[in-house]
Structure formats: C-alpha cells, structure tokens
Amino acid sequence: MRAGRGATPARELFRDAAFPAADSSLFCDLSTPLAQFREDITWRRPQEICAMPRLFPDDPQEGQVKQGLLGDCWFLCACAALQKSRHLLEQVIPPGQPSWADQEYQGSFTCRIWQFGRWVEVTTDDRLPCLAGRLCFSRCQREDVFWLPLLEKVYAKVHGSYEHLWAGQVADALVDLTGGLAERWSLKGVAGSGGQQDRLGRWEHRTCRQLLRLKDQSLISCSVLSPRAGARELGEFHAFIVSDLRELQDQAGQSILLLRIQNPWGRRCWQGLWREGGEGWSQVDAAVTSELLSQLQEGEFWVEEEEFLREFDEITIGYPITEAGHLQSLYTEKLLCHTRALPGAWVKGQSAGGCRNNSGFPSNPKFWLRVSEPSEVYIAVLQRSRLRAVDWAGRARALVGDSHTSWSPASIPGKHYQAVGLHLWKVEKRRVNLPRVLSTPPVAGTACHAYDREVHLRCELSPGYYLAVPSTFLKDAPGEFLLRVFSTGRVSLSAIRAVAKNASPRAALPAGEWGTVQLRGSWRAGQTAGGSRNFASYPTNPCFPFSVPEGPGPRCVRITLHQHCQPRDTEFHPIGFHIFQVPEGGRSQDAPPLLLQEPLLSCVPHRYAQEVSQLCLLPPGTYRVVPSTYLPDTEGAFTVTIATRIDRSPSWQ
C-alpha cells in the first residue's frame, strides 16, 4: 500500500491518526480476497479523484449504492435506508459540514453511528482507498458523489478495519444507522406434510403482499444464502435491495406481483422470465412493460413473486421511523411512542444461568415491565459484541478479557455473539415467588435461542406487571446486553437487583500487614457521572491517584468500590472501575488524556452490586483509579478503598 499522488493542498488537511491511511485500517488478518491488492491500494482525497466532488447528488438516482471489492453488501443495503428518509440521513450525516469547495474545508468528515443505546459521533479524514485512481470499495452511481464511501470509511473505523466489514447482517447495520429495530423473515421452511407446505405457502404470499404496504416507508432487503440450480448468477451469501413492488393485472385479469431488485454489484444478474426481453412480459400490456423496464437502473431487474419466493432465502426489513423519532409497527402501523432501555450483563458464576433447561435459569438478569394500558409492545435484547466495542473516539477496541480471542471475517456469522433468548411472564404483583413463577409457562418467548446480535418479541399486552428474563443458551456464558422496550402505550421498566442484606460479604484480605486508604466521592449528573468507557463523557468521572512504593517486586493491591445505599434499598447501580498507569515522567499528566488510553486493569462488566473488588499485583509506580456507573448521568455516592500489602524487610541485630 502506498500513498496516492495528487495536488498538494495549500493548507495542512486533517489526518486521522486513529484510523490512518495504512494497512492497519484496511486489514485485520489478511484472510479475505482483499489481501491480493495490498501493494496496489493507494489513498486519495475526493478532490484528487475527480475535479468537482460532491457529498450528495441533485438527482437521488445518482447517489444509488454500488459495491466494490469489499464484501460489505449487508452494510450497503442498509445505507439505502438513508435515501428513503431525509430525517435519517441528517441524523447519520450531520448537515452543514464544510465540503471541498468551501473555504472552511479541513479534510475531515463526521458521522453518527448508533452503538448500544447511544449515538456516537465519529470523525475521520476523507482519504479513501483507491485502485488505479478510482475508488476500490463502495461508490455511488455517479462517482463524483461521496456520501457513501465516506460513511463506509466511518463504519470501518468503528469496526477496526475495512476487512472487518467482510460479511455481516443487514439487520445489524440497519440498527446501527437508525437506532431502531429490524426483522428477518425466512422465506424457507422445513419440508413437512402437504398441509404444512400449504400453510407455509399462504404465509409467504401474505409476506409479499405486506411488503406492498411497507415499500415506501421501510428499507427492504433480500438475501441469497445458497443459490438454486439455474440461478447461480445471484451469488452466494449476497444481499440485495428490494427497490420497488408493483401489483399488475395480466391479460386474463389475474393479479401479478413484481418485485424490483437492485444488486449492489451494479450489474444485472437475473435470467428469469421477467428479465429484459423475457417471456414474462408477454402477459401484460406493452405500455406497462415499457414503463417498468424504463425504470430500471444499473444493476436492477424485475422478479415475479413465485420466482422471488423460490430463489431468495430471507427478507430483512427495517421498522419505519417518523421524523419525531418514533418507530412504527410493521404489523399494525401504530406508532411505538413509548420507549425504555436498561443495560444488563450475564456474569459467569453469578447471573449467567443459561436457558430454561438449566437449574440456574432463575439467576439470570430479571426486569419488571409495567404496562399501564392495553398496548402493542416490542421487547428486544441487544448483545454487545464479545470481540469489539467502540471507545470515546469511535474507534474499535478489544473488549476487556477478550484481547487474545482470534477472529476472521470469514468466520461463521454470529460466532462472536452468544445464543440468546427472551421470555416473559405476567404476574399479579411485584412481590412474587420468583422460582414458582419461572416454573410456569411464559406468556411469550422467543422460539429458540439465536446467535443473533438482537432478538425481540412482539406482544399484545394487557395492563399489569410482567417479568422479563433474557438468557444465554449455555450456563456461565458471559456477555453484556441492552434491554429495549417499544410500546404504543405507557410502560415502565426496572431491573430486579440483588437485595443489600444478601450481598456477599467483602472478601478478607490475604494474611499479612496491609496499609489501607479510603477515598470518598460521588457521581453527579452533568458533572462527574460520565458513565462507562463506551461514552465520550467517560473522562469526566472522578479520578483518584495512588502509588505503589518501591520494593523488591510488584505489590499485592486490593481495590474495592462500594456504592452507598440505604439498608432497604434494593436498586443498585451497575458499577465498575478501571486502573490506569501514569507513564514515567508523566507525574503531572492530566487525567483526561490519560483516560483516553487503554487501562492497565479493569473490574468490568459493570455489576448490579453494592460492592465490587479486584485483587491485583502492581509494580511500583503511580496510578489512577476511575470508578464509574454504566450509564452517564447516573447519580450516587461511593467509597474507594485501596489496600496495599506492606512487605517488611527483615531486621538484623
């Protein structure tokens, strides 16, 4: 890989040191076909690629997505959702950014990506990968339009590299670009009796008719997992965009449903009955044929409903989102105006009880859902990837405890997620016998535990209290999640947390002499409640310095974070802490820059407990401990206790 040549700008333009124009931004392990272009890829800014670059086109068709050498059709299909909604587009790409013709242009580009409950603002430079002077990854229909390749670069930065985008789920990218929900509808069922096949056929027919109503409001994508004989041109593990649906009458008066499919590869790959010049068009009026064929853009083709159900395996559809930010039901078109969200974690040996087949199921995280009026309710469990998380700057980082995990973009989809499920019970009141309730059949539940980033339930719920229990399939499978609720009526959501009197006593210090220091502090909304490292406000958390004295070797240190609660208070905040080492010569280093580095040690995931503790060996030096709640603006008081073992040298008389 080498730097591209072009006109030298009159002023110094921004260069993103966190995502440089280098192999580290292109590749993660050179396991994909991209590796063969390693020596040929150059980096160029848009004004070095064409004479008059634009961010957006005047004609929307000129901004149509096209795939390059990168296997990220799943992401590009989701990007097409932004073309359907000005509101969503401006949510992801903030308007008013200086572009190439502006005096204020600095060579930077900012996007917002929704990550685990929050919109994360990510900035990078506008140097883009090229081959022979042309964009080698995504591009728009008109190559002087750059919103798509710039957004792709931001998304690659969030994931760690372009190669990390090789293979994924359209549904995941839709959620990242909208903050909403997405559903996957399988078009294939397990073959059974004739009756089952008939029911499946009627369900598929209803699905396609449903798409007619949703086509103008929702992004609809379809995928081929393994092409049938005679349709190899569709490719394997490839995603397409359903850009239009039309219901026609044939010459006999029978209904025909046609779907217009866009291939992100930018080429027409369909040889079915309704291809251009195909015999299917003889069934409809010539004027209709001329109209529909004239609408085709590069890479688009028409498919009849029966062909579609036979050749495609899956549909992914994003929930419509209004300009006010409310989701709309795919099934009833009602607005889901009421939303709630809470984080949680499955902790090995504590709250990772496994599925309902395991005796430990009652130990899983549990949540109260109160429904105030008859409502259509969606409850979703969103997992955090076990391999990557996004830090304050929008950069991908390895999760604590996973730094030695290997991953290849060619891995099985879902390999870096747990198999998760969700079950819901209705109860008469909040004070119930939980083991007894959990032994009864739930009122709703996922059909199975799935290796998906997010699973959700759709329920019609009457007023009352409900108990929601997200779980992993395997016991002691660790992970973090976000429980989200969307409802047409008023709802409240709260976590069932450990009772203080049942909290585990503080572990005794190992034998020996210990020096102990106690530090008191508090988290205050808008001031010192910065939340976890996933949020840009993390550096505002309280930060306490401490030191380990010189000695023959590392010292044993126990750090304990205790949140102050009333004796009857059962609602703990999820808490944790990180330890940062101050570099030699950095005695006066300010806390914020230090906290943007990787911590030396961590006590995470954040736990719903009154107290968390970590015993560690630390070499002599200066350190800072930063206690935090999981979410920003969560208020509370706490005490940090630092106990350092004192090594006494023997005295000689």
UniProtKB/Swiss-Prot annotation:
Pfam families: Calpain_III, Peptidase_C2. Residues 13-321 form the Calpain catalytic domain. SMART domains: calpain_III, CysPc. The active site is at C73, H238, N263. Disulfide bonds: none annotated. One of its GO terms (biological process) is proteolysis. Its EC number is 3.4.22.-. GO terms for molecular function: calcium-dependent cysteine-type endopeptidase activity. Keywords: Hydrolase, Protease, Repeat, Thiol protease. GO terms for cellular component: cytoplasm. Residues 322-494 are annotated as: Domain III 1. The keyword tRNA processing does not apply. It is an enzyme of class 3 (hydrolase). Residues 513-653 are annotated as: Domain III 2. Belongs to the peptidase C2 family. Calcium-regulated non-lysosomal thiol-protease which catalyzes limited proteolysis of substrates involved in cytoskeletal remodeling and signal transduction. May play a role in insulin-stimulated glucose uptake. PANTHER family: CALPAIN (PTHR10183), CALPAIN-10 (PTHR10183:SF30). This is Calpain-10. It comes from Macaca fascicularis (Crab-eating macaque). The gene is CAPN10.
